[in-house]
Amino acid sequence: MTKKLSIVRLKPKPECFDEFLQNIRAWQLQVHADDDHLLMRTNEEVVAVVVRDSEMLHENIQRGVAWLDSQRPLLQEYNEVDRHTIPMTGDLVI
């Protein structure tokens, strides 16, 4: 079975950073309880990393976008094209 690796960069507003980090931690623990998932923080960004079965990708993305819609007021836009996230997904090789 093919595994997918997804990396999503998010940039919370400075005054909302801790609130957003708490929200995404709670959401990932709830939604990705059976999958491998990690969160990384930098001074300005939160980066979510998830490994999942390829069959779950479409459903997980739909659920993730719905959750993200509720969090957009806490996030800064990167630019007019990427908006609030910079995502990357592909086949896990190793």
Predicted regions and their residues:
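Active-site-flanking beta-strand signature of metal-NTP-handling nucleotidyl enzymes
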Residues: 3-10, 47-49
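Short, surface-exposed ligand-recognition loops at beta-strand->loop->(often short) alpha-helix junctions
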Residues: 9-23
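Short, charged/polar surface micro-motifs in flexible loops or helix N-caps
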Residues: 14, 45-46, 53-58
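A short beta-turn/loop motif at secondary-structure boundaries
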Residues: 38-44
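Short aromatic-enriched loop/helix-cap "lid" or pocket-rim segments at secondary-structure transitions
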Residues: 49-51, 94
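Short, low-order "capping/linker" segments at domain edges
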Residues: 84-94
